[in-house]
Amino acid sequence: NPDEIVARSLFLWSENPDTQLLASIEGGTIFEITVADGAKGVNKTVREVSGVKDMLYIAIRRGGKLIIPTGDVVIMPDDVITVFTKEEAEGRSVEYMDELFR
């Protein structure tokens, strides 16, 4: 039901205000989150915080520079992480990122 999908999506994003929806594309979503100082995921590598199936780190902005995230890149406070997730993993991905980085 399309109305349920819209309602579920609105609820998800309202419950996670520190996570910004950048784009919805057919079958997936691109969003970003700014890493809080003291968050669980700080000082961990992308490999260590890649715990959700069907989610991919696509960019990290740090101090005005763009980083293409490989497994060895270490997450730092104030990094802005951009993620792509398949539609069916959107809720899981947003919750996971909020838990790690907020």
Residues covered by each model-derived region:
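Phosphate-binding glycine-rich loops and their immediate beta-loop-alpha structural context
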Residues: R102
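Cytosolic Rossmann-like ligand/nucleotide-binding regulatory domains
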Residues: V35-M97
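Flexible, Lys/Arg-rich cytosolic regulatory linkers and terminal tails that connect or flank
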Residues: N1-G41
